[in-house]
């Protein structure tokens, strides 16, 4: 648990040290957190490796696929991100689904597919009306799509 605390304190070098130790003890949650640490340090390659290891250890996992999607978005591979989001949705809890669907909006927006991003954002805000960041995103996307035609 110290690795998690270090991660949230943004002390990534200590987090990495603790989490690497935990992975040696077959702690699969540590793989997930290690992926987050690597991604926070812009080490996308190692982050992807951790998320893939996590998925192979626990099976299909919304958290693992969401991590891979975040790596793909960081790398500019939006189609792969959307593929990983699709793979993660069937096993997602409500919180995980919220994260996956928000990242889906981001991926479409980064692809400059504002019409699809707008549709996804409207669906998202209907499902998660309390998400103020998504409401801002929706307002932004409306400006992007109304000026297209």
Give the positions of each predicted feature.
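Canonical tetratricopeptide repeat
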Residues: 1, 33-36, 67, 103, ...
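Short coil turns that delineate tetratricopeptide repeat
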Residues: 24-27, 59, 93-95, 129
């Amino acid at each position: 648990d110290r690795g998690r605390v270090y991660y949230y304190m943004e002390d990534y070098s200590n987090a990495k040290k603790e989490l690497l130790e935990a992975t040696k003890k077959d702690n699969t949650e540590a793989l997930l957190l290690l992926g987050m640490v690597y991604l926070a340090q812009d080490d996308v390659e190692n982050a992807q490796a951790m998320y893939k290891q996590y998925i192979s250890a626990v099976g299909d996992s919304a958290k693992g696929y969401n991590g891979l999607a975040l790596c793909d978005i960081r790398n500019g591979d939006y189609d792969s991100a959307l593929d990983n989001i699709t793979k993660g949705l069937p096993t997602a809890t409500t919180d995980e689904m919220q994260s996956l669907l928000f990242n889906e909006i981001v991926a479409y927006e980064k692809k400059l597919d504002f019409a699809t991003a707008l549709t996804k954002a409207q669906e998202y805000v209907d499902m998660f009306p309390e998400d103020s960041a998504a409401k801002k995103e929706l307002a932004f996307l409306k400006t992007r799509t109304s000026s297209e035609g």
